Regions:
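Compact, glycine-rich, soluble single-domain proteins
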Residues: 1-74
Length: 74
């Protein structure tokens, strides 16, 4: 299973599924990361956390632990 955490800088991927439960999953989906949406990885902080993404035309930063819950198709 490929997750958003595995995506390389400068690449685009499509979300297949958002894993997790409860408030964490809801928060990810509230940020606009839902099934079928395209995500572009702009950059990653020097220590790998957080990751800066472009989602639905806006900039978004998420933690690696949240990125692991997002299954992608590169």
């Amino acid at each position: 299973m490929n997750t958003l955490k595995d995506l390389k800088i400068g690449k685009t991927a499509r979300v297949i599924k958002v894993h997790g439960e409860g408030a964490v999953r809801r928060r990810i989906m509230d940020m606009g990361i839902t099934k079928g949406v395209e995500i572009y990885l702009r950059k990653v902080a020097p220590l790998g956390d957080p990751m800066e993404l472009t989602v639905r035309g806006y900039e978004l930063s998420i933690r690696k632990e949240d990125a692991q819950m997002i299954e992608i198709e590169a």
